[in-house]
C-alpha cells in the first residue's frame, strides 16, 4: 500500500512556492505587458519616469486582472482534488490537474508555428534521451513557445507605438537644423511634444485597455 509522505508534501509545497515568481514571469501576461510599458517609456524619451518599480507594479496588477479566471479555475481544481495530495504519486497527478487552466491559457496564446519548432527541436536535441516524444501541448513545449510568442507580440506592439514618437524626433531635428540651432539637443524640444501627444490622446488608458483586451480572444 502506498504510504503518505508529509515530508515530501512539505518539500513539494516549498518548491512550488519558490517557483511562483518564475511562473508569474514566464507563464502569464506579465512579460508582454512589462516589455510594452518599457518600450513606451523609451519611445517617449523619459528613461526613468515612471521608475522600473512602478512599471513592474503596473504589469503585476494588470497580469493579476488578466489571469484572474485562470487562478480561480486552478483554485477550484485544487479544492476539488485536495484529497489527492496525500501521496507522492497523487501529488504529481494533482499538480497536473491544478495546472491545467494555466496550460490551456499558454496553449491559447502561443503560436502554432513556434510550438511546432520546439517540438522539432526536441526531436533533434533529445534524440538520445530515453523519454517518449513530446506533443505540442506538453508543458516543456508550451512554456518556451508561450514566452517567445509573448515577446514577439510585445515587440510588434512596441514598434507600432514607437513610430509616431520617432516622427516627432525627426521633425524636431529637421526644424532645429533649418533654424540653425544645431547646438540645441532635439530631446529638449521633442520630449515635451511627445508627452503632450501621449496625454492628448489619453495614451495611458488606451494603452492599458489594449493590453488587457488583447487577452479577450
List each model region and its residues.
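Hydrophobic alpha-helical segments and their helix-loop boundaries in membrane
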Residues: 1-217
Amino acid at each position: 500500500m502506498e504510504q503518505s509522505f508529509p515530508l515530501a508534501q512539505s518539500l513539494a509545497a516549498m518548491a512550488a512556492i519558490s517557483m511562483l515568481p518564475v511562473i508569474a514571469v514566464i507563464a502569464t501576461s506579465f512579460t508582454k505587458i512589462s516589455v510594452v510599458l518599457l518600450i513606451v517609456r523609451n519611445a517617449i524619451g523619459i528613461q526613468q519616469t515612471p521608475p522600473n518599480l512602478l512599471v513592474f507594479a503596473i504589469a503585476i496588477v494588470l497580469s493579476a486582472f488578466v489571469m484572474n479566471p485562470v487562478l480561480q479555475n486552478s483554485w477550484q481544481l485544487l479544492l476539488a482534488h485536495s484529497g489527492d495530495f496525500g501521496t507522492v504519486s497523487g501529488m504529481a497527478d494533482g499538480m497536473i490537474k491544478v495546472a491545467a487552466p494555466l496550460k490551456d491559457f499558454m496553449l491559447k496564446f502561443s503560436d502554432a508555428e513556434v510550438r511546432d519548432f520546439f517540438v522539432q527541436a526536441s526531436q533533434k536535441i533529445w534524440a538520445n534521451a530515453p523519454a517518449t516524444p513530446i506533443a505540442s501541448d506538453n508543458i516543456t513545449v508550451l512554456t518556451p513557445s508561450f514566452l517567445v510568442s509573448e515577446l514577439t507580440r510585445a515587440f510588434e506592439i512596441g514598434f507600432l507605438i514607437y513610430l509616431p514618437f520617432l516622427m516627432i524626433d525627426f521633425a524636431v531635428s529637421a526644424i532645429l537644423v533649418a533654424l540653425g540651432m544645431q547646438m540645441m539637443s532635439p530631446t529638449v524640444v521633442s520630449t515635451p511634444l511627445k508627452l503632450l501627444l501621449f496625454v492628448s490622446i489619453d495614451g495611458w488608458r488606451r494603452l492599458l485597455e489594449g493590453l488587457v483586451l488583447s487577452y479577450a480572444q
